[in-house]
Structures are given as structure tokens and as C-alpha cells.
Regions:
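Short, positively charged
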Residues: 1-104, 108-109, 113-380
Length: 380
């Protein structure tokens, strides 16, 4: 069940629009009483209100924050009622109570659907395969930005990194050590056989492996565990190679080749009819995203799946590698308004360099939002 703030954000708008269309006299102060709020909601909202009833049944008063949500709901309801010319024939349902549905609509007022959740347009923390599937309609289960798109350069990056590690040990008496204040120890050292041992100790438990001085990427991946890669090898890189020119040059070369290959794949296989619309919060039916603050009310029209291809397109997909960070920049444009949104996917390891599969975390460039590419209905 959603929290009380989310429920109030949705049902306050639905209730007040309903009171207005039914011409029921009320004061905003009456809605500050949970019992009266519930009574009014039951009068004007059709369908199931179980979550609202459960949420309000056990409280005697609203907090100041909850009262502010109701006040903002009142402002938004007034705009919706007037702008969309709501009349008595329009049925109001609270769709936010339906946890099984796929679309983002929270309240339905006649033929108009509204999404009111504050997190309706949050960014994505996705695996690379999810990004590719969203853009192309592919069905990958996993994808590695470096191994799958620039394996030769990825192997070279590892070799350069390993070479710098060996050079460090040769220059510092054959050992590197990092002790954590919580009692863990990460150690690299040259053993009696002139091989390199990786060791990680925590809570009196030690994990270790031995690697040859001439170590390849396949051998490294086969012989090491996630702990040894993340807690030893990656810690060494962070502490000693962040400004190393050889390391950074190899990493940048790999990032550039990989992102150029990925951008090419995305552009050549772009599929507007599959997962991409859902990725952009486009669904079968047109709906409106609405939000209100103490300062203003904003309502945006989100096109239907059928209208989508005529209104919104991906203008470009490009490789972008500042310093050595592997990025994909996607520019989306509304063809009617000319407004553009740039999305940045940062392809990076989340648990240390060369450890696991990199993610493709998505960010908006220049403080953007998906709302930029939708049509303004109200912004006051």
C-alpha cells in the first residue's frame, strides 16, 4: 500500500474535483479532518477506496505536511475542473488504488487520465541490456559495455593496469597494503615464487589467490573472486592509478571504442514501436502529468502510443567520453515544439574497476526532465 502522502496527493485532487462537479458545498478546512475527508471522498469517487479507508481510519488529524498536500491538491483540482471543463456526467475513479495496472494514471476523470505521483518521471538505474532493449526491442539478458563492444581495448586496458601494478610492487619492496579502520585488510605482494598474491581479510576470514606476473584478463577473471577484485585490485587502482597517464589513456581508448560501437548499434536498430515508448512513459492512451507546489501548477499532455511517433523522435545518439568516462548521450526532440531533452547514460562499474558488469545509470543533462518533451497544458 502507498504511503499516506501519496494517497492524499491523489485522492485530494479526485475528491475536490468531484465536490465541484456535484456542486457540493464544502470548505477546505473540512478536508483537514480525516473523517470528513473520507466521507467526502466516498460521496464523489467511484470504485474501490480500500487503501484510503485503511489509511485514514486510524488517524485523528493530519500533519502540517499532509495539510499542505491537501491545499496543493485543492489548487490543482480547481485548475483541472476549469481547464478540462469537467461536468456531472464525468465519472471519477482513483486508479492509484489499483496496484496491478501498467499505466501511470492515478485518477481518471471522465475521459481524462492524470498521473500525479511525484516519482512518475524518475531517472533509471539500469543495466546496459535494459537500455539496449528499451531502444531496440532486443531481448538481451546481460550486456557488458567493454567486453561486448571493445574486447580488444578492454584487454589492453587491463594489461596496462596490471603492468602498472607490477611496476608499483617492484618499486615498493614487493608489497601494497590498505588497512581499514573497521579491521579489514587488502594486500598485494610478490610471493616466493615471484607470483603476485591478492589477499583480503575481514572478521578473521581471509580470501586470497595467486596470479602470474604476466597475467591476462581471462586468467584474472577466472582466478579472482568479486571480493578480491573489488576490495583489493580496485582499491589499489583507486589509490594509485587515478592520475596515472598510462592507465587513463588505456581506459579512455576502451571507453571511446565501446561507446562508439554501442551508439552505432542503437542508431541502426532503433525501434519506436517496442520498449522505447514505455521507457519514455508513453502508453496506449493519452494522459496528463500534473503536479503542484506552493508556487505553481503544471499540467503536461503525454501523447498516446499512436500519436507518439508523430510527436516525439530521437534526434541523435552519440558517444561522449569526457576524460575517460564512457557515456552515451541521447537527444530527444518534440517535433511540434522543437524542445529537446538530452539523456546521459554513464556506463561504469558499480563495485570497482574490472569487477562484475558495468551499469548504465541514466541522468538528465542540464537539469532536464521528461516533461520537457511533452506539451504544456498549464504552467502557472
Amino acid at each position: 500500500m502507498a504511503d499516506i502522502k501519496t494517497i492524499l496527493r491523489e485522492t485530494s485532487v479526485a475528491t475536490i474535483v468531484g465536490l465541484k462537479k456535484e456542486e457540493i458545498e464544502y470548505t477546505i478546512e473540512e478536508l483537514y479532518n480525516p473523517s470528513l475527508f473520507l466521507q467526502y471522498a466516498k460521496q464523489v469517487i467511484s470504485g474501490e477506496l480500500g487503501s484510503l479507508n485503511d489509511s485514514l481510519d486510524s488517524i485523528n488529524s493530519f500533519s502540517n505536511e499532509e495539510i499542505n498536500i491537501i491545499n496543493n491538491g485543492n489548487k490543482l483540482a480547481d485548475v483541472i475542473f476549469q481547464k478540462f471543463q469537467i461536468d456531472k456526467e464525468d465519472t471519477i475513479t482513483w486508479e492509484g488504488n489499483n496496484v496491478g495496472k501498467e499505466d501511470p494514471i492515478d485518477i481518471q476523470i471522465g475521459k481524462f487520465g492524470f498521473s500525479l505521483k511525484e516519482d512518475s518521471f524518475i531517472l533509471e538505474n539500469m543495466g546496459l541490456y535494459q537500455l539496449i532493449n528499451s531502444f531496440t526491442g532486443s531481448s538481451y539478458k546481460t550486456r557488458h559495455i567493454f567486453k561486448d563492444y571493445a574486447y580488444k581495448e578492454y584487454s589492453e586496458w587491463f594489461s596496462k593496469t596490471w603492468g602498472e601494478l607490477v611496476s608499483y610492487l617492484n618499486n615498493y619492496n614487493g608489497e601494497w597494503r590498505l588497512d581499514n579502520s573497521k579491521g579489514s585488510s587488502s594486500i598485494l605482494f610478490v610471493n616466493s615464487n615471484n607470483d603476485i598474491k591478492l589477499s583480503y581479510t575481514k572478521n578473521n576470514s581471509t580470501r586470497e589467490c595467486v596470479l602470474p606476473k604476466q597475467c591476462s584478463l581471462p586468467v584474472f577473471e577466472k582466478e579472482t573472486t568479486s571480493d578480491l577484485r573489488g576490495k583489493v585490485f580496485s582499491k589499489f587502482i583507486n589509490q594509485n592509478l587515478k592520475k596515472n597517464e598510462i592507465y587513463e589513456a588505456a581506459k579512455k581508448k576502451c571507453a571511446k571504442v565501446a561507446t562508439e560501437a554501442l551508439a552505432k548499434e542503437l542508431k541502426e536498430n532503433l525501434n519506436y514501436s517496442d520498449f522505447l515508448p514505455r521507457f519514455l512513459r508513453i502508453h496506449k492512451m493519452e494522459y496528463y502529468y500534473a503536479k503542484t507546489t506552493n508556487a505553481n501548477v503544471e499540467i503536461y499532455r503525454v501523447p498516446s502510443l499512436k500519436e507518439f511517433v508523430n510527436e516525439i523522435e530521437i534526434e541523435s545518439i552519440e558517444s561522449h567520453v569526457p576524460k575517460s568516462q564512457a557515456n552515451i548521450l541521447t537527444t530527444i526532440i518534440n517535433k511540434h515544439t522543437g524542445r529537446k531533452l538530452v539523456l546521459r547514460n554513464e556506463c561504469r562499474f558499480s563495485h570497482g574497476q574490472f569487477n562484475g558488469t558495468p551499469e548504465a545509470k541514466m541522468y538528465y543533462e542540464n537539469n532536464g526532465s521528461l516533461l520537457v518533451i511533452y506539451q504544456d497544458v498549464v504552467n502557472s
